[in-house]
Each structure stands twice: as C-alpha cells, then as structure tokens.
Regions:
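C-terminal, helix-dominated tail/subdomain
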Residues: 209-265
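Aromatic-lined, polymer-binding surfaces characteristic
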Residues: 9-225
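Low-complexity, Ser/Thr/Pro/Gly-enriched N-terminal "stalk/linker" regions
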Residues: 1-2
Length: 265
C-alpha cells in the first residue's frame, strides 16, 4: 500500500476484490475449479501480506486502513471477498481455511471493528449511523457467517456491545431511512449503501430466517430501493450532498434490484 484513491496500488486491490467476487460466483455457476483455485491462491497471498501491514503510510484519514488509505475501503474489500470465500469454501482444505482466517479475515474484521494500536477510531465508525458503518457491519457480519463466527454476526447486527442500543445493522435500518425509505445522506449515498444493506440482508435471510429481515420495518429495504429509483432524472441521481455522477446503471443498484426482485418478484 502506497497511494490513495485512484492510485495504481489502490486500484489493483480494488480489481483484486472484484476478480475474487466474480470468480467465486462463476465457480458456483459453472463448477469449474479454475475459478475457485484463482480465489484460493489470491486469498493465500493476502494471508501472507496482511499480517505485515501497519497503518497505511499515506495518513490522509483519521480512520486509516491497512490495505487502503481509509478503513471504508477495507470494509468494501471484505464485503466482496466474503462472498468469494463463501463460494469456494468447500474447495479449500481445513489447513488452508485455518490459515486464511487466522492471518487475514479475523485480523481484518477485528481491525474494522476496533482499529489497532493507539487508534481505535474504527470502533466509533463501526457503531455510527452512517454509510461507512453500513459497509463495516456488512463486512464483519458476512465474513462472520462464512467463518461460522456467531460473535461477529451479533456485533454486526447489534453493535459492538451487542445490545442494539449503540449501533449495528438493525439500528441503521431504523435510523438511516424515513418511513418511506428516503436515506438521510441523499440519493448518491443511498446508491452507495444500498448494496451492503441488501446483500447482507440476503445473507441474514439465508442464515437467520426467523429475523424476517426483508419484512423489517414494513419492508424498509424494498422502500429504500423504490425511493432511490425515484430520486433520479433521465437516469441520473439528483446531486444532493457531495454527489458525483452516478445513475440507474450503477452496479450497486443493479445488484440490489436483482436481490430484492428475487425476494418479491
């Protein structure tokens, strides 16, 4: 890690998580083990790299990451990679899984929740009512499901203290959306957060169906998708907050539409 957003190394780590995500899905769809091997090899390489990393050297953020200049990007990396790991889990030996989890996923999840050394700003972010916290809780919860770590899942759902009173994914669903599904940070960030909201909810539905997560708060996630689409003109989202140019073709929205259509065709 040497650069910030847009830098060569930063973009390579982004390309890596996209590649792992898509290869994991490709393995599930085709059964071709070359896709699983690609993911497994890359995870083993990251498991060697990650323990050697301190805070990112750029020091541009009060919540610096290790692979990336800010922890937010670390959370995004883990959301994608958790899917890839789950998709190829049974192709790895128990020894491979133990090494990857011990050296990569456990320390990364712990870092996202609590930081390290003298900097524990990540704990505040993890429990915040903010899009960064949505990515963080989704990342920790999804890798928790993949590793069968109930403690991680509980913290992701109900905050660091496990009560749901300070933070967590459920509290975010209560506080970040109006009853109609409008997001407190505007359309641009609603677009950014919709995928971790929906894909983590899909995991919760699969693993903890009694929570009935897609029905929670009168189906607030479906309402959020509907309002997000309405917050556009000629295919482009309204420029509220510090918005950049994004529209209905954004990959986060495409994934969210697919998942929620499957929930309620």
């Amino acid at each position: 890690p040497v650069d910030g957003g847009g830098g060569v190394v930063h973009e390579q780590h982004k390309s890596n998580y996209y590649a792992m995500f898509h290869c994991g899905v490709a393995y599930q769809l085709t059964g071709d083990k070359k896709y699983a091997a690609y993911v497994g090899d890359m995870l083993e390489a990251y498991a060697k790299l990650y323990p050697t990393l301190g805070f990112h050297p750029l020091q541009l953020s009060p919540v610096p990451g290790r692979l990336f200049w800010q922890t937010l990007n670390e959370s995004v990396w883990l959301v994608h990679t958790a899917v890839a790991y789950d998709c190829i889990y049974n192709t790895l030996s128990s020894k491979q899984r133990a090494t990857i989890e011990k050296n990569l996923f456990v320390p990364m999840a712990d870092f996202i929740m609590d930081g390290m050394g003298d900097n524990h700003a990540n704990n505040k972010t993890f429990n915040k009512m903010h899009n960064h916290a949505t990515w963080a809780t989704a990342a920790v919860g999804m890798i928790g499901f993949a590793m069968n770590r109930e403690d991680y899942v509980k913290k992701a759902l109900y905050g660091s203290d496990g009560t749901g009173k300070r933070g967590g994914f459920i509290r975010q669903m209560d506080y970040l959306f109006s009853p109609d599904g409008y997001f407190t940070e505007g359309a641009y960030y609603q677009r950014y957060a919709i995928w971790p909201f929906v894909i983590f909810a899909q995991c919760i539905e699969n693993k903890l169906p009694d929570l009935k997560i897609f029905n929670y708060r009168d189906s607030i996630l479906s309402k959020a998708l509907s309002t997000l689409i309405q917050l556009s003109y000629e295919g482009e989202f309204f420029h509220i907050n510090d918005a950049l140019l994004k529209g209905l073709s954004a990959q986060e929205l495409v994934y969210a539409v697919d998942i929620l259509y499957n929930v309620n065709p």
